[in-house]
Amino acid sequence: MKIQLLSDLHLESHPDFRPQPAPGADVLVLAGDIGSYQAGSLLAERGDADFGLARFSPRHGWPVPVLFVPGNHEYDGLDFDEADARLRETCARLGLTWLERETVVMADAAGPVRFIGTTLWSDFDALAPPDRPVARPQPLPVRASPQQTPPDSPLTEQLRARDKAFRAANFYLRKTSGTRGGQPFLAQAVREQSLVCQQWLRAALAQPFDGTTVVITHFAPSLRSADPRYGLTPGTAGFCNALDELLPAAQLWLHGHLHAPSNYRHRGCRVVANPLGYARKGEQAAFAPLLEIDTASLV
């Protein structure tokens, strides 16, 4: 099966971007941040109420099935749960397959392919100094602070690292104007959503499957996907998780979020990202609009 991968098109900034189907592709994967309604959105100015997704609609001419995993920016300027419902309705109306904590199996001549999708979000613990191997099976406590733990304990160091990651993330999250239940959707709420996604993802990957497994997330599963322009800083934990122990359960992991491409193999899994990014930041040179990943090459 040949998979075309696109992410981080940010159509709110690039509304005239016109994607082309990759010749020979069997399916298109949209790995999040396709379009949003943040302040100044050109989609909103032009009256596009479909997050820019109509141009990918199989009902409007896109030639192959389209799988959509929402990114973080789809929720900008909106209530989280209202945006979620609106995105689901949009996908159903346009004929896109919604993959937020959903699994779909597609037939292929070489054998079935299972797509497991979730935004994933971030638990902000990717850079926490571990008191056990990095591939830790359980995340740190959902709610805790360094002031609640012994000052020299490994847990305190982990919580300090998380607190730094929270502060870095909240600097930007406050600008997005996203809310949930009337409250700003900030780092702690993102973490809690991430833990829900992680629990679901672990359960989905644990289900036996005789075929190829492809995971699609918006947030990255590993620090190996970190943007080399910035190195490893507290802000990196808002883009990458440290879920490397899950990689062996899949043959292919597709993601977005970072505006830097990835294409590497780790722990038996190929990890690929193909973001467009922002033109104003000079991030688009490495984007491959017709990128295809052939699952036959994963063996």
What positions do the PLM features span?
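Binuclear metal-dependent phosphoesterase catalytic core
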Residues: 227, 233-251, 259-299
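Active-site neighborhood of phospho(di)ester-bond hydrolases with catalytic His/Asp-centered motifs
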Residues: 5-7, 28-33, 66-72, 97-102, ...
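Beta-strand-turn-beta hairpins that frame and shape the catalytic cleft
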Residues: 1-4, 103-117, 161, 265-270
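Soluble or luminal CAZymes and related metallo-dependent hydrolases
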Residues: 45-52, 83, 189-200, 235-239
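Active-site environment of divalent metal-dependent phosphoester hydrolases
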Residues: 10-17, 36-39, 73-84, 99, ...
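A basic- and aromatic-enriched beta-loop-alpha substructure that forms the phosphate/nucleotide-
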Residues: 65-147
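Active-site-proximal loop/helix segment associated with metal-binding centers of metalloenzymes
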Residues: 116-214, 221-225, 229-230
